[in-house]
Swiss-Prot record:
Keyword Nuclease: no
Keyword Ion transport among record annotations: yes
Site features described as Required for activity, chain residue numbers: 363
Catalysed reaction equations from the record: ATP + H2O + 4 H(+)(in) = ADP + phosphate + 5 H(+)(out)
Keywords, ordered alphabetically: ATP synthesis, ATP-binding, CF(1), Chloroplast, Hydrogen ion transport, Ion transport, Membrane, Nucleotide-binding, Phosphoprotein, Plastid, Thylakoid, Translocase, Transport
Protein family (similarity comment): Belongs to the ATPase alpha/beta chains family.
PANTHER family (UniProt xref): ATP SYNTHASE SUBUNIT ALPHA, MITOCHONDRIAL
GO CC terms in record: chloroplast thylakoid membrane; proton-transporting ATP synthase complex
Described purpose of this protein according to its UniProt entry: Produces ATP from ADP in the presence of a proton gradient across the membrane. The alpha chain is a regulatory subunit.
Name of this protein: ATP synthase subunit alpha, chloroplastic
Subcellular location: Plastid, Chloroplast thylakoid membrane
CDD domains according to UniProt: ATP-synt_F1_alpha_C (cd18113), ATP-synt_F1_alpha_N (cd18116), F1-ATPase_alpha_CD (cd01132)
Main location group: plastid
Length: 507
């Protein structure tokens, strides 16, 4: 029989008494009443905040969006297949936030900032709220530095400045993503951090963008935030805010950032789905009443910060998809009114082989002209005017057979100018190359060439000037002005190359 030793028992009791913790923790809990379609109705959670994170028994996280008199509507950040009626939920006391650090550069992450590229964890010591207030009026300064996209049509006629919000709008399959990715490629060596947010895209499309950026060495300064079409609506709704939080981290550290939201139509659809399932009253096109606020609070976070805050910037290029060119639909009109201009991509131009398919007539940049360099202003004014006159004449010429010589010349010039605006995908041009290209067109040097020869000649001209007249690029780069000296170098180079080209073509 085991002998019971009183001293051992008293020691154990003494230890237990010493270890006793008198701390009382109060946990705000609730019970699941109903769950399905990514929404859970919770009874209890009396002191929960709007937007607070809640945790279910089996580990799923949700956001409390609807605070009603007898229950709380929670949207789930996962499939929630293991959540059952009656299971318990606890409030975490936290609002959604993500870790942020330099280590995110070159990575592909989801809306919760978890890596999805299979390259291991990302170390981060700081965190930021996903929903942060936008900088106030005093914290900002007006846009004055250019953000070059590398596309002639945009940089000359619809210029974008650092800190601007410029909408890219058009039907499906008109090259909206291509314009955005070309802009990322053109930031190489410009000390700009890029964030590409893919919302509700096909996983294959996102993989294609990532591969294209990797091949050209652009992932070194880029972060990709992706929530594909099969992701829960909650995560598709959160993805743009996650991207904005990452871009803000760099902006407040005196760096320049570019963020692309591809696309906000899908985010609005995800938000509509959540709102209707939460039984919020539908408005126009069944979107909830606060869908304008959904986008305005996101896009207002893009800014050019004042000198006191370090002059960092966040430039936003939101993308919106239209249905058969209808710009007057609800989401397009909302985003047009929030942004500082729009680049309109036309399906007709795209099908006619004009790519990028930018409709220059109805595209505008409301603040970008202040950011254009002087040399570009000097050549772009004439280009814009001649293209506008050409568009008018072309419509008129369809109905008239006998045109006078001056009109024929103007039409011929317009066709060549339209040709010089065409660019291959992933082939951005430097601002000096753009200036020499536009100057060649607006000063009539292309008028003697066949339309089919224009692009071939321009490619050779850019190579020739780079090799034989490097002084031109040096003057533009240092003075940002098309000086008389630079113009004479340019004229000489164009004349020499034109003579060589015409001789080649004759052979």
């Amino acid at each position: 029989m085991v002998t019971i030793r009183a001293d051992e028992i008293s020691n154990i009791i003494r230890e237990r008494i010493e270890q006793y913790n008198r701390e009382v923790t109060i946990v705000n809990t609730g019970t699941v009443l109903q769950v399905g379609d990514g929404i859970a109705r919770i009874y209890g959670l009396d002191e929960v905040m709007a937007g607070e994170l809640v945790e279910f028994d089996e580990g799923t996280i949700g956001i409390a969006l609807n605070l009603e008199s007898n229950n709380v509507g929670v949207v789930l950040m996962g499939d929630g297949l293991m959540i059952q009626e009656g299971s318990s939920v606890k409030a975490t006391g936290k609002i959604a936030q993500i870790p942020v650090s330099e280590a995110y550069l070159g990575r592909v992450i989801n809306a919760l900032a978890n890596p999805i590229d299979g390259r291991g964890k990302i170390s981060a010591s700081e965190s930021r709220l996903i929903e942060s207030p936008a900088p106030g009026i005093i914290s900002r300064r007006s846009v004055y530095e250019p953000l070059q996209t590398g596309l002639i049509a945009i940089d000359s006629m619809i210029p974008i400045g650092r800190g601007q919000r410029e909408l890219i709008i058009g039907d499906r399959q008109t090259g909206k993503t291509a314009v955005a990715t070309d802009t990322i490629l053109n930031q190489q060596g410009q000390n700009v951090i890029c964030v590409y947010v893919a919302i509700g895209q096909k996983a294959s499309s996102v993989a294609q963008v990532v591969t294209s950026l990797q091949e050209r060495g652009a992932m070194e300064y880029t972060i990709v935030v992706a929530e594909t079409a099969d992701a829960p609506a909650t995560l598709q709704y959160l993805a743009p805010y996650t991207g904005a939080a990452l871009a803000e981290y760099f902006m407040y550290r005196e760096q320049h950032t570019l963020i692309i939201y591809d696309d906000l139509s899908k985010q609005a659809q995800a938000y509509r789905q959540m709102s209707l399932l939460l039984r919020r009253p539908p408005g126009r096109e069944a979107y909830p009443g606060d869908v304008f606020y959904l986008h305005s609070r996101l896009l207002e976070r893009a800014a050019k910060l004042s000198s006191q805050l370090g002059e960092g910037s966040m430039t936003a290029l939101p993308i919106v998809e239209t249905q058969s060119g209808d710009v007057s639909a609800y989401i397009p009109t909302n985003v047009i009114s929030i942004t500082d201009g729009q680049i309109f991509l036309s399906a007709d131009l795209f099908n006619a082989g004009i790519r990028p398919a930018i409709n220059v007539g109805i595209s505008v940049s409301r603040v970008g002209s202040a950011a254009q360099i002087k040399a570009m202003k000097q050549v772009a004014g004439k280009l814009k005017l001649e293209l506008a006159q050409f568009a008018e004449l072309e419509a008129f010429a369809q109905f008239s057979s006998d045109l006078d010589k001056a009109t024929q010349n103007q039409l011929a010039r317009g066709q060549r100018l339209r040709e010089l605006l065409k660019q291959s995908q992933s082939a951005p041009l430097t601002v000096e190359e753009q200036i020499m290209t536009i100057y060649t067109g607006t000063n009539g040097y292309l008028d003697g060439l066949e339309i089919g020869q224009v692009r071939k000649f321009l490619v050779q001209l850019r190579t020739y000037l780079k090799t034989n007249k490097p002084q031109f690029q040096e003057i533009i780069a240092s003075t940002k002005t098309l000086t008389a000296e630079a113009e004479s170098f340019l004229k000489e180079g164009i004349q020499e190359q034109l003579e060589r080209f015409l001789l080649q073509e004759k052979v």
